[in-house]
Amino acid sequence: MFNNKTILITGGTGSFGKKFISMLLDRYRPKKIIVYSRDELKQFEMQQKFNAPCMRYFIGDVRDGARLEKAMYKVDYVVHAAALKQVPAAEYNPMECIMTNVHGAQNVINAAIACGVKKVIALSTDKAANPINLYGATKLCSDKLFTAANAMVGDRETRFAVVRYGNVVGSRGSVVPFFKNLVANGATELPITDERMTRFWLKLEDGVNFVFKNFERMQGGEIFIPKIPSMRVVDLAKAIAPELPIKVIGIRPGEKLHEVMCPSDLYYDTIEFDDHFVIMPSFDIKKYDYTTNAIGEKGKPVPDGFDYNSGNNPHFLTVEELREMNP
């Protein structure tokens, strides 16, 4: 699908962007890959690793609509991965988070439509479902913008979809590097907020594969949600440092005990497939039948009141499995 195509990824110097580009170069022969991001040092460092002739590096901010439009000239596919995602920072700097995560999303949409991009996938988070913090609220707003964008295109070909998933193993700012840093610096205990806390858990490679697949599946307007395992944070602490005691410090503002991917309030718009769910748009877009996707896979409506959260997930990782995922 990506052979001889031009792909742009916003926030391309992040954990997801690096893995996405690595796998893209391994599997396909793209015409051009454009990394669009703000930090020239990260781009310089990335160029040392990814220096294939097809690579291009654009310094720019998703807040800058004109720069985005220049970057998307003759682009076929866009992955929107740029975001401010640190929950405490978003609470303290709310307008900065809104400018990047909401206004930036609309700028990506406008540029993609103006440039005739074929397909756009925006990355989302489980924190966008029933959000209780500003970061989650901005990502929910972004999801709504990308879904509604399919009604803005008229007779043009541009299509938009969203991929929502949970915590990515070892990503920047996540709990794994936090725990490992404590251990490396001689910590005598590991802090967790609540022994009951659970999270969805995803390997970065699986997240990239899910995005690849959904470029094929998408018709426009879907929120794609993978069926992935959950983990107990207390088990993760045991996997990383089994010899250290655990200190319960209390839940932080903006945290949930369990994260939600498919809210029960949207069960009537949720379709289950073999390895994923799809939340359909709440209004008709092009009269698509979302129970059959673009590659012919068939799904079925979920039961009344269905919700998919990290606490009721039938698949939990064991301490041993977590240790293998976090060597």
Where do the PLM segments sit?
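Strand-loop microenvironment adjacent to phosphate/nucleotide-handling motifs in alpha/beta enzyme folds
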Residues: 4, 114, 148-327
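Conserved Rossmann-fold cofactor-binding substructure of NAD(P)-dependent oxidoreductases
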Residues: 56-77
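Conserved Rossmann-fold NAD(P)-dependent oxidoreductase catalytic core, especially the SDR/UDP-sugar
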Residues: 80, 84-140, 144, 148
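N-terminal Rossmann NAD(P)H-binding glycine-rich loop of SDR-like oxidoreductase domains
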Residues: 6-26
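Hydrophobic/aromatic anchor residues within beta-strands of the central parallel beta-sheet
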Residues: 57, 97, 160-163
